[in-house]
A protein has these predicted regions:
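Functional-site microenvironments in short loops/helix caps that host divalent-cation chemistry
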Residues: 10-230
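Non-catalytic, alpha-helical, charged scaffold/linker segments
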Residues: 3-5
Length: 232
């Protein structure tokens, strides 16, 4: 192939291989979660069977993306071995796809459960998050909780708000609303190794156990850097 200057471009110049350390950061409870019983959590969260159905934490965007590639290849190999038709690859959702899934088919709702409030009619909190300043336990959990602790949304999806935040594939930009629409719902661009860090930010959605209720809203958006391994 020739580039715009008429020079030959080799395959190695536009296909980049990167090895990604796949295991989550098991020390994340000490390094990032300063008020979460971090010593016993560090020792048991990733190994004790009591946490088997708790969400994984300490996963960077690169690790999450690498997992989708591995899972797609595993699925492809299985389908080929059984002579079954292939299907679409696994991937991280775009910001728009995540919000669509979080709404569960509802229109104009603030939260995945469909209502505008974070409590039900009996005063019970509807997700695992931080209800107030320094208050992590009012919802019954001082940190992450069992993934089915709260009801799923109308699509049957759990934890679309609270517990842990979720990575998306979308680049974060404060002015993204000026560029996205129904025909182009995701703001994205090619990120190069030498780009400044603010160009590499990725949208995270859903809010986590250590976020206030605002970030649990379907429309709320935040960002993390690709190498971040915090409450995600």
């Amino acid at each position: 192939n020739l580039n715009k200057n008429g020079l030959t471009v080799t395959r190695d110049e536009f296909i980049v291989r990167e090895e990604v350390y796949i295991y989550p950061d098991t020390l994340v409870w000490i390094s990032d979660f300063t008020y979460s019983q971090n010593d016993p959590m560090t020792k048991g969260y990733f190994s004790h069977p009591s946490f088997s159905n708790y969400p994984v934490v300490g996963v960077s965007w690169k690790q999450a993306k690498a997992f989708t590639v591995w899972r797609s290849r595993l699925n492809e190999a299985y389908k080929l071995s059984k002579n079954l038709p292939l299907r679409l690859d696994y991937d991280l959702p775009t910001e728009a796809q995540f919000e669509y899934a979080a709404r569960g088919g509802r229109v104009g709702t603030s939260y995945p459960w469909g209502g505008p409030y974070i409590r039900n009619a009996k005063g019970c909190l509807l997700a695992n998050f931080k209800p107030g300043r320094g208050n992590y336990v009012d919802d019954g959990g001082a940190f992450t909780v069992y993934v089915k602790s709260y009801f799923p949304n109308d699509y049957g999806l759990y934890n679309m708000a609270g517990n842990v935040s979720e990575w998306t594939s979308s680049i974060y930009n404060e002015t993204a609303t000026a560029y996205v629409n129904s025909l182009n719902p995701s703001f994205d661009k090619a990120v190069k190794e030498g780009d400044p860090d603010y160009n590499k930010r990725r949208v995270v959605k859903g809010g986590s156990w250590k976020d206030i209720g605002y970030f649990l809203q379907n429309s709320a958006r935040a960002y993390e850097y690709p190498d971040s391994e915090e409450n995600i």
